[in-house]
A protein has these predicted regions:
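N-terminal secretory signal peptides that target proteins for export/translocation
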Residues: 1-15
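N-terminal hydrophobic alpha-helix used for membrane targeting or insertion
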Residues: 2, 22-24, 98
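Helix-centric, low-specificity signal for extended rod-like, repetitive segments
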Residues: 4-6, 26, 34
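A periodicity- and composition-biased signal for non-globular, repetitive helical segments
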Residues: 10-13, 19, 47, 52
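Bacterial N-terminal signal peptides
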Residues: 16-29
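Noncatalytic, solvent-exposed loop/strand surfaces
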Residues: 29-394
């Protein structure tokens, strides 16, 4: 159960930014010896691995390898078998002009850190300037996804690109060239559903799109102005009768769509105002959604039709994680918000169990954006300036 305090078990410093992703890869590679981590937040998008990872590491301790990247990136690495895939970007000058912007996808050998291949995705059309909040995450924030044969990567206005495991480009599909009114850039990650690659292109075209895995052909497109500022990754709910729904959180609403057609099945009004950056969390037929700057969180039961605000909203709360997607574990939701406060809330009621400032996190600014993951019963949170924190879940 969740206790009314948090205690840091370990804190590990991060090496310079150009190598930071590779420390995560090292830990993630250990996690994935017994299981693949094929998408954002791993299997089922739950952020939980069964295997153990080290409690301590440094430049020399518990570090199997490190590999220099072409530039920074905010996406998570993914792992399939002996391959690690990670993205980054380069070519942004000191004035913030992205005219020479290049995105990169790397395939790295998990055992040695050797780069098997690297592919460059050149800028296609105008891109948002590197200024304001875009500097907080950059141009490589969308985690790739793989089905074990092909790796799919989303590069915002440069589109969705599919590569074979040998590095051959299979197809490339544009999903829009627009910008939101904030000009914050893209953040949502791809998910797979059957033969479809599903992309939240809210930033690029105020749409969610499904592409055919084999060809990149657009199968359906769901559009709506309400999608603006919806930066989270959609999720899939499997109902008790076997039917499935695609769910996504957006400002003031949660949507349930038919993943085969994109048709809107139901919607629920919420108090998730402002930008909505956290991704939905799915547990059985329950969807948990957290707001961004405006705050708020909500639990909604899937499976309804039409406006389900009065019938399917299970609870609402004023607390939020701002950017991070909380971790659901044994009936509790865990996260550290952007100000460095650790939270635990009841998944059944939304009631706050504890809120505590983490002393090891530097105050000021926004020190935490990363979503927590769990390995061997411990919670790992990567901070922006204070390394990686390891905390108990109980």
């Amino acid at each position: 159960m969740c206790v009314k305090q948090t205690r840091v078990l370990a804190r590990q410093q991060i090496v310079p930014a150009i190598l930071a992703a590779m420390l995560a890869v090292t830990a993630l590679g250990a996690v994935c010896r017994a299981e693949d981590w094929s998408q954002f937040r791993g299997s089922g998008a739950r952020g939980i691995a069964r295997s153990a990872v080290p409690l301590a590491w440094s430049q020399t301790e518990n570090l199997h390898w490190k590999t220099r990247l072409p530039g920074p990136g905010s996406a998570s690495p993914i792992v399939h078998g002996e391959r690690v895939f990670v993205t980054s970007y380069s070519g942004v000058d000191g004035n913030g002009a992205p005219a020479q912007l290049v995105r990169h996808l790397l395939c790295i050998d998990r055992a040695t850190g050797k780069v098997n291949w690297q592919r460059q995705i050149a800028l296609e059309g105008p891109e948002d300037s590197y200024q304001g909040y875009l500097t907080e995450h950059g141009y490589a924030s969308n985690t790739p996804v793989t089905d074990g044969q092909t790796v799919f990567a989303f590069f915002g206005k440069s589109g969705v690109v599919a590569f074979a495991f040998d590095g051959k480009e299979l197809w490339r599909t544009a999903v829009g060239k627009e910008s939101s009114n904030r000009h914050w850039g893209s953040g949502a990650s791809l998910i797979l559903h059957g033969d479809l690659v599903i992309c939240n292109a809210s930033e690029e075209s105020q749409s969610i799109r499904a592409l055919e895995k084999q060809t990149g052909r657009e199968v359906w497109k769901a559009e709506g102005a309400a999608l603006e500022l919806a930066y989270g990754t959609p999720g899939i709910v499997t109902l008790s009768d076997g039917k499935q729904e695609l769910v996504v959180a957006l400002p003031e609403e949660v949507w349930g769509l038919d993943p085969a057609t994109g048709k809107l099945l139901w919607h629920a009004d919420t108090a998730l105002t402002g930008n909505v950056s956290p991704s939905v969390i799915v547990d059985g037929e329950t969807i948990y959604a957290f707001g961004g700057r405006g705050g708020g969180s909500v639990a909604v039961k899937a499976g309804g039709r039409g406006d389900v605000t009065k019938s399917h909203v299970l609870w609402t709360s004023r607390v939020t994680s701002y950017v991070a997607t909380p971790l659901l574990h044994e009936g509790h939701l865990y996260w550290i918000d952007d100000r460095g406060q650790a939270f635990c809330s009841s998944a059944a009621t939304g009631a706050e169990v504890y809120r505590q400032r983490v002393a090891e996190i530097t105050s000021g600014g926004r020190p935490v954006y990363a979503s927590p993951i769990m390995a061997d019963g411990r919670i790992y949170v990567v901070t922006r300036w204070n390394g990686t924190l390891v905390l108990p879940a109980a």
